[in-house]
Amino acid sequence: MEKEINYASSYVARVTMDVMGELFQGARLTMNWLADCARLIASRGQPVAWFSPVGVPVVQPYRQSKSYTIVTILQNLVLSSSDDYLPIHKQRQVTAFPPNYVHSLDSSHMLLTALEMRKRGLEFSAVHDSFWTHPSDVDEMNIVLREVFTDLYERPLLEELKRNWELRYPDLIFPALPEKGTLNLEEVKHAPYFFQ
């Protein structure tokens, strides 16, 4: 039964990703570029590392684990070690990087929003991508969210990432950046919703 469930979920995931790729071709090309770069870095036995837009250093910790089984009279205990001296887990480095990079962008947006809210004397709280303030300040928070978002994404983030990697991994030749889309970020400031 477990085999059938794995097969079915893999099939559904593949179909979903294919449809998403058709609907959001630019995003798919960017995700593919991120994965290709991660594959290149991992092929040299290096963990994928980068700086978030606010300067936080990020290193993916995925390494092959080493298991030890301890047999006792009461039970068998399996201990797993994933120390820094172990080789990287290449597949996890590749598959985890695109979403991890996006999370670093999201967290940068959250931090920059919190700083701007504080600068304006407004309360702010957040969990993951859910942002809160007092009901009387929601309209102002929506303005701040959009201003910070457009300021962040007006930066050439992929170019910055590639330049950083070219310095960090000088022996690697990274593929050309994906083509930029046509979204006018200024429209986000006036849209009722971020995505329509």
Say what each PLM segment does.
Residues 1-196:
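Conserved catalytic core of nucleotide polymerization and phosphodiester-bond processing enzymes
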